[in-house]
Amino acid sequence: MNVEPIWQPVLLEEENTVTSHREPGEEFLFYRSVAAGLIDAVQDNCSRGAFENMEGVGKLSDNPVTNLRYHFVVTAAMLTRFCMEGGMPLEEAFGLSDEYIRRMDCCNNMSEIVYVHDQMAMDFVCRMRQLRKNIASSKQVAEAIDYIYVH
């Protein structure tokens, strides 16, 4: 691969810096929980402050607020795709994502971004829960669907 000289110092600096990234398991569990409509699991994730824990995640910006903004956009994109895969209509999913990204764009600090993130996660999960309830034709079917998504 031929890399332009302007990028070589950046690449060399990155090679000398050891960055430890955590496994994506917890992150993907969060996305699957939202798509499955598992409100309690998502509330737990938000109350634990999992989103604001920057340990082991990529450093997308040297500015902590900008870094969190970028991670917010990634989360919004992932939730959108997981929820569409779970049955949320395309326009609803993209509309939610766009709206919450615009709300985040008005935030001035990390705590405001975290607040909007938690609102977004709860909005997506509640909509997915309602969607799944509408699909289930009986209590037994709803319980079976819950069991499948949890396991």
Residue ranges and their predicted role:
Residues M1-H151:
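Inter-domain helical "communication" segments and dimerization helices
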